[in-house]
Amino acid sequence: MRKLKNILITGGAGFIGCNFIHYLFGLSNSGTDLFGDANFTGNVVNVDCLTYAGNLENLKDVENRDNYTFVKANICDKAAIDKIFAENDIDRVVHFAAESHVDRSIKNPEVFVETNVLGTLVMLNAAKAAWELPDGTFKEGKKFFNSKEI
């Protein structure tokens, strides 16, 4: 497996996202078998729109790291997400951003569909655009995969 260089984490100010960021930077030992290296040396770009579940206070201990960047953006904003991919040479995405409180989904289901479905589609399309070559192959380190093989 290729070493992670520039990882985009969506929803990184939420409970799961901020704990994952702490894990990557070696500030937590839970789940060390996931990536094998709890002292991640690549760059983390944390994208969160800071709704009711996002709290940057949970990331005070990483906010001044040279390899950490926070971007306040909504995952449904195609232009913002495309810009983040282009400016940061993203090679991996961990997508935690979501509307998750069931009681809120009853009052306003449209927001849930927009974020959880359309926002995920924006992320997938941005990754595809960033990683797909003109001939239909996808870049992965020094290897190239044809979309028909995947």
Range-by-range predicted roles:
Residues 1-150:
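N-terminal Rossmann-like NAD(P)+-binding domain of SDR-like oxidoreductases, especially those catalyzing
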